[in-house]
A protein has these predicted regions:
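Ligand-binding clefts of soluble mixed alpha/beta catalytic domains
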Residues: 1-182
């Protein structure tokens, strides 16, 4: 039940790690990302579990933790089940875009072993940033896409959407159908 889509990040991590082996870091910061050192089958790992929407603090927390793991060659397990980055101008002003770019660069630069477990939603830029791993494992029923449905249909069905009387409703209808299909 811990890996069910929408599960709290710490519950998703607890379903995979050895019992009572987790030492959480940065617990009071970036609450929608869980970061901990733990063991899996007796082997030390760094766990990053992302849930809900990620604000600039969540992204900064994950980035710092992955850099720490990489510095000591601790393998990183990333559990992805998130609705993406917080879509708000205030979060962007607070550094959301900069931190998201830093997170993507941190995962790309890390030379330690990286495993991404796609447990629920892994859509859009957050998928690209968090699932940049040596091995990706998708749980049955998860949603994986490099583009958000609205962005995908605006490219795939551009002419059809532009020809409609109501562009917004046509885009939303196509996006819903695309999300159900993919």
């Amino acid at each position: 039940a811990g890996l069910a889509a929408g599960a709290a990040p710490e519950k998703a991590a607890a379903a995979l790690i050895d019992k009572d082996s987790a030492v959480e870091l940065f617990a009071g910061f970036g609450k929608h990302v869980y970061t901990a050192f733990a063991t899996i089958g007796g082997n030390a790992v760094g766990v990053v579990a992302a849930g809900e929407q990620l604000c600039h603090n969540c992204v900064s927390k994950a980035s710092r933790f992955v850099r720490l793991c990489d510095a000591f060659s601790v393998p990183v397990l990333t559990i992805v089940d998130t609705n993406g980055f917080v879509p708000s101008a205030s979060d962007d002003i607070a550094g959301g875009i900069r931190e998201a770019a830093r997170l993507a660069a941190t995962y790309a630069d890390a030379t330690t072993a990286k495993v991404a477990l796609l447990a629920g939603k892994a859509v859009g830029p957050v998928y690209t940033a968090l699932a940049n791993a040596d091995l990706k494992i998708a749980v049955n029923g998860c949603t994986v896409s490099a583009l958000e449905p609205n962005a995908a249909v605006s490219v795939l069905y551009k002419e059809e959407i532009d020809a409609s009387d109501n562009i917004i409703s046509a885009t939303n209808a196509k996006a819903a159908a695309y999300a159900a299909e993919v």
